[in-house]
Amino acid sequence: MASLGLLLLLLLTALPPLWSSSLPGLDTAESKATIADLILSALERATVFLEQRLPEINLDGMVGVRVLEEQLKSVREKWAQEPLLQPLSLRVGMLGEKLEAAIQRSLHYLKLSDPKYLREFQLTLQPGFWKLPHAWIHTDASLVYPTFGPQDSFSEERSDVCLVQLLGTGTDSSEPCGLSDLCRSLMTKPGCSGYCLSHQLLFFLWARMRGCTQGPLQQSQDYINLFCANMMDLNRRAEAIGYAYPTRDIFMENIMFCGMGGFSDFYKLRWLEAILSWQKQQEGCFGEPDAEDEELSKAIQYQQHFSRRVKRREKQFPDSRSVAQAGVQWRNLGSLQPLPPGFKQFSCLILPSSWDYRSVPPYLANFYIFLVETGFHHVAHAGLELLISRDPPTSGSQSVGL
């Protein structure tokens, strides 16, 4: 993976951050080691949580683990070259081995819980499928949509059909890089936000990883640029309202996917600090804050619009300590739907096995259960990339506000 000057980007940015970070800067080896230790400690706690809940985690959750495992390989190689980071490099190696073992063990449970889904998407669990960026760019604010459209036509089922066509893993023995007219329309539809937008980005990221270059897939980078510009806009909105809990999952997912897309401006030190603060120290997962913040309460009070949330397979753990938080569907991050009467909130949530929102009563499907991922890959992308980059940014990239 190419190095880039995220350190200089953070120090030389023309625009001041919305909130400054209390983490040490990255201008010395000592400060890099301090932050690296914080990140690794968070990932190690999350790994313990993963190992304890492995039979309950679905394929989507394990895909995130695979992405992190690939990331750790690059991190270990680079940290081994710096004396102060060498001990941490050994920890990275041990963590990577644990994650690889967890992925292999998970295949047994996935074959039992959802064999069809595993057959269709097992390719994304294979080593080498996820290719880390070799060059870095920044989002272009001029590509942000003036308004977001309705998400009614977007669903997990339709998205899965398109992804299977692209991978070529369907039962019809189709070749990879397939693209029907329906999928072309769905995956290039303008005005998407939230999980609709992240599904679109995922489609074109996978197209690039599969080497698909026919038709609209020849313009994969153009669509990736478009989608990540809008995901950056949504992340800034989430930051502006104080990282209200219902926005955190998509906030982290945007960092992961656009980081994989090569957008260095998603790696902000203050965003890393925020993500690290969301981890439950004892449990290791990333879940519901202890108390609702003022911004969330205000947003809920004044919300007017919402749209159905499209999130790849998720579910509560059976021994969670309270009823699921019925969550939010939003067209923008200021539109938050309040909880249905009688619903409480989780303290720890994850991407587990086989729960599907399509099987719940209609009123719950409309609100949809809001769950949050373990954060393995999100913390890695928001943090580890900050620590393995060195090359100074170009003059164009310096103009991007962090």
Curated annotation (Swiss-Prot):
<dbReference type="GO" id="GO:0070062">
    <property type="term" value="C:extracellular exosome"/>
</dbReference>
<comment type="subunit">
    <text>Homodimer.</text>
</comment>
<keyword id="KW-0325">Glycoprotein</keyword>
<keyword id="KW-0964">Secreted</keyword>
<keyword id="KW-0732">Signal</keyword>
<dbReference type="InterPro" id="IPR031751">
    <property type="entry name" value="DUF4735"/>
</dbReference>
<feature type="signal peptide">
    <location>
        <begin position="1"/>
        <end position="20"/>
    </location>
</feature>
<comment type="similarity">
    <text>Belongs to the UPF0764 family.</text>
</comment>
<dbReference type="GO" id="GO:0016020">
    <property type="term" value="C:membrane"/>
</dbReference>
<dbReference type="Pfam" id="PF15882">
    <property type="entry name" value="DUF4735"/>
</dbReference>
<dbReference type="GO" id="GO:0005829">
    <property type="term" value="C:cytosol"/>
</dbReference>
<protein>
    <recommendedName>
        <fullName>UPF0764 protein C16orf89</fullName>
    </recommendedName>
</protein>
<dbReference type="GO" id="GO:0042803">
    <property type="term" value="F:protein homodimerization activity"/>
</dbReference>
